[in-house]
Amino acid sequence: MRKNESQRETKETEVSVSVLLDGTGSTTVNTGQPFLDHLVSSLGKHAMFDIDLKASSRDGIVHHLVEDVAITLGGAIDKALGDRSGIMRFGHASVPLDESLSEAVVDLVKRPYHRIEMKIKRPEVEGIAKEDLEHFFDSLLRNLDCCIHLTVKYGNNDHHRVESAIKSLAVALRMAVSADPRREGPPSTKGSM
């Protein structure tokens, strides 16, 4: 069973998360930030990960909460993948949300690189600063320890841009973490990821 339970406790926040990669998309998320809850729930729902995440701020600073949720969640997914043997490794998805379109391309090789183009226009979306939303994706992907290109192609509504981005990432991750029944060991000519 590909599962991980992780905690992160600092003077700024307290975060606990349980992730089951081979789940049904069931999520229970409570961070105190409704849009952050929505993003994490959307990731779980469309990646088919079961996610139970609780987070609280100790200092009242939204940036710290957003960052620590992403760090803990990304790390938990990474740990749940183990040595990444027998997985598809690659995934890609284009996902619309009304007028917005996003694309995610994933390689679960353990070489961290990511490029994110969000194209958020407003200073904040649903009570979270633009730079904190961008930092959420950055921290999540950095701690997932893989290579991901995530691009919002276009859109007029910033909420839709961000939501289509998380959903395209989720669908691409679902593909990449899927078991490959024909593969034994790591999906790499090197013999390890």
Swiss-Prot record:
Subcellular location as annotated: Cytoplasm
Transmembrane annotation, as ranges: none
Highest taxon of source: Archaea
Pfam family, one: IGPD
GO molecular function terms attached to this record: imidazoleglycerol-phosphate dehydratase activity
Keywords for the protein's UniProt record, in alphabetical order: Amino-acid biosynthesis, Cytoplasm, Histidine biosynthesis, Lyase
Matching Gene3D superfamilies: Imidazole glycerol phosphate dehydratase, domain 1 (3.30.230.40)
GO cellular component annotations of the record: cytoplasm
Pathway assigned in UniProt: Amino-acid biosynthesis; L-histidine biosynthesis; L-histidine from 5-phospho-alpha-D-ribose 1-diphosphate: step 6/9
SUPFAM superfamilies reported for this sequence: Ribosomal protein S5 domain 2-like
CDD domains: IGPD
EC numbers: 4.2.1.19
Main enzyme class: lyase
GO biological process: L-histidine biosynthetic process
Catalytic reaction annotation: D-erythro-1-(imidazol-4-yl)glycerol 3-phosphate = 3-(imidazol-4-yl)-2-oxopropyl phosphate + H2O
Similarity field: Belongs to the imidazoleglycerol-phosphate dehydratase family.
Protein name as it appears in the record: Imidazoleglycerol-phosphate dehydratase
Native source organism of the sequence: Cenarchaeum symbiosum (strain A)
